[in-house]
Amino acid sequence: MAGRLKNKKTLITAAGQGIGRSTVLAFVCEGAQVLATDIDPDSLAILKEECPQIKTRLLDVTKTEAIQQLAEETGAIDVLFNCAGFVHHGTLLDCEESDWDFSFDLNVRSMYRMIRAFLPAMLESGRGSIVNMSSVASSVKGLPNRFVYGASKAAVVGLTKSVAMDFIK
């Protein structure tokens, strides 16, 4: 079933490694026009060598101005795949307030920033899909020693459902 994403203009965050990287490779195999973003220039360069048909862009998803600039330059996209995230290891007692703040900034607020920047053009064009990467750590059971990670990924589920209820027709 190759070609399911043929010519779909796609932006993927945290594309240099892990799930983001695998998503880039899978989307390219399905025919997507991929813009791969990451904060690590070396991982993007390696990805570009392996997949020369993609475009790459350095992007720190914790920086609203950088996201807004990219949205203005890019215009309407068909798929926004929010994959950036951070796993804090530990329980509530191991979690400092700074760990909580960083985890929620990267795992949740960055998705808010990306959606806020790219959704208007999607709505104007009458098309678009948003994928927000969550985790089984957000489930009813959760995972041990992933306190703030699980809490932040549960917030991703809530954010996703709220956006969907407001904008899916």
PLM features per residue range, with description:
Residues 135:
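Residue(s) in the substrate-gating loop at a strand-loop-helix junction
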Residues 120, 165-166:
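Alpha-helical segment proximal to the catalytic Tyr-Lys
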Residues 91-92, 99-104:
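Substrate-binding pocket helix/loop in short-chain dehydrogenase/reductase
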Residues 115, 152, 160:
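Active-site helix of classical SDR
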Residues 16-17:
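Conserved glycine-rich cofactor-binding loop
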Residues 95, 141-150, 162:
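Active-site loop-to-helix junction immediately N-terminal to the catalytic Tyr of the SDR YXXXK motif
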Residues 84-88:
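Conserved NAD(P)H cofactor-binding loop of Rossmann-fold oxidoreductase domains
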